[in-house]
Regions:
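Short glycine/proline- and acidic residue-enriched helix-loop micro-motifs
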Residues: 47-59
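Conserved acidic-Pro-Pro-aromatic motif
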Residues: 72-163
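A short helix-to-beta-strand connector/capping loop
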Residues: 11-16, 59-60, 80
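Conserved residues in the N-terminal Rossmann fold of short-chain dehydrogenase/reductase
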Residues: 18-20, 63-66, 85
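SAM cofactor-binding core of SAM-dependent methyltransferases
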Residues: 1-37, 44-49, 117-119
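Alpha-helical elements of the RecA-like P-loop NTPase motor core of helicases
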Residues: 2-3, 40, 93-97
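Short, well-ordered beta-strand micro-motif
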Residues: 30-32, 65, 159-162
Length: 163
């Protein structure tokens, strides 16, 4: 996916790409690469993920760089309203922790969260809601809820607004 994103934004001088993941500490980690491009994660892919979303099993692992957001951007880089989208397959809380020094500059955070564990060790939606509430973000909307075959809510997109 990184090469596709590079091609997409290659000629846009308003876009700067950093080939790194966001997390609380600077380090190298293994990415569990899924057979489907949209299901890879730093966390191991769980059995429920593979059963609810067939074809998302792990195909291989890759080493990637990870670090806090302030390693790539500073306060001066945020000039207007800031909208942050997080869709990281179970690693949401660690991404938010990696944004800790700059999160007060965000106006909106749009994050995909799960109601059940799909990736080993992931936090669930209620934990993300609590984390952001403590940091003065309120839940402003819930979108795109996916239900499994039995009707159980699996995951949704959550929009948080700074108060």
């Amino acid at each position: 996916p990184a090469n596709e994103i590079k091609k997409l934004f290659n000629s846009d001088n308003k876009v700067t790409l950093f080939q790194s993941a966001i997390g609380p500490q600077k380090k190298n980690v293994e990415m569990h690469v899924s057979k489907r491009k949209d299901s890879s994660s730093i966390l191991p892919i769980g059995n429920r993920q593979a059963s609810i979303f067939p074809g998302t099993e792990e195909s291989h692992k890759e080493k990637i760089k990870i670090g806090p957001l302030n390693q790539f951007l500073s306060k001066k880089d945020f000039k207007k309203q800031v909208f942050v989208k997080i869709d990281v397959q179970g690693y949401e809380l660690d991404v938010l922790k990696g944004c800790e020094d700059l999160i007060h500059l965000f106006d909106f955070i749009y994050v995909e969260c799960s109601f059940i564990e799909l990736y080993e060790g992931q936090v669930l939606a209620h934990e993300i809601i609590e984390y952001l509430n403590i940091r003065s973000f309120i839940l402003d909307g819930i979108y795109n809820t996916y239900h499994d075959k039995s009707g159980i809510a699996v995951q949704s997109d959550f929009l948080f607004k700074k108060i």
